[in-house]
Design a protein with these regions (language model features):
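Walker B catalytic acidic pair
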Residues: 52-54
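Structured extramembrane domains adjacent to transmembrane segments
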Residues: 7, 25, 48-50, 64
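GG-anchored amphipathic helix commonly corresponding to the ABC/SMC/Rad50 NBD signature/C-loop
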Residues: 23-47
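Extended helical coiled-coil dimerization/tether regions that scaffold
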Residues: 1-20, 40
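Single-residue recognition of alpha-helix boundary sites
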Residues: 40, 63-64
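Conserved catalytic network of the ASCE P-loop NTPase/AAA+ motor domain
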Residues: 20, 39-43, 73-77
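C-terminal lobe/lid and adjacent interdomain/linker elements of RecA-like ASCE P-loop ATPase modules
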Residues: 65-122
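Conserved D-loop-proximal element of ABC-family nucleotide-binding domains
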Residues: 59-60
Length: 122
């Protein structure tokens, strides 16, 4: 699917430089995936979505808004939301936006082979 979407400021409705950035496009794609799953949540359709690094390099306020949005949609539509996050990208989150033990399924590290996804060092 090809589409063009631009970010406009709310007051003057003019396109801003945010529309040209990689972070904006990443969030737009993630929101589209999530909206699609929400729309089809009552049908025989996928019940999960996976996004890699969608919070990377995002402003802290946007991270918190996105986490709030994902939690709401996942609970409301019974969707499993799978997200990869680099730990350093979550340090500044306020406590209510930090991931709970119930939300974290796997923690990977490069400290030892056992902490890697396939438990193998190359």
């Amino acid at each position: 699917i090809d589409f063009e979407a631009e970010y406009q400021n709310q007051e003057e409705l003019i396109t801003t430089d945010l529309a040209r950035g990689n972070t904006y496009k990443k969030i737009l794609c993630a929101a589209f995936d999530t909206a699609l799953l929400q729309f089809y949540s009552q049908n025989s359709f996928y019940k999960f979505v996976y996004h890699d690094g969608v919070l990377d390099s995002l402003d802290i306020r946007k991270k918190e808004k996105y986490i709030e949005y994902v939690r709401e949609i996942a609970n409301k539509s019974n969707i499993q939301y799978i997200l990869t996050v680099i730990e350093s990208e979550t340090h500044d989150l306020r406590s209510e936006y930090k991931f709970t033990e119930d939300e974290v399924r796997l923690i990977l590290s490069d400290v030892s082979c056992e902490d890697k996804l396939f438990e193998h060092c190359f």
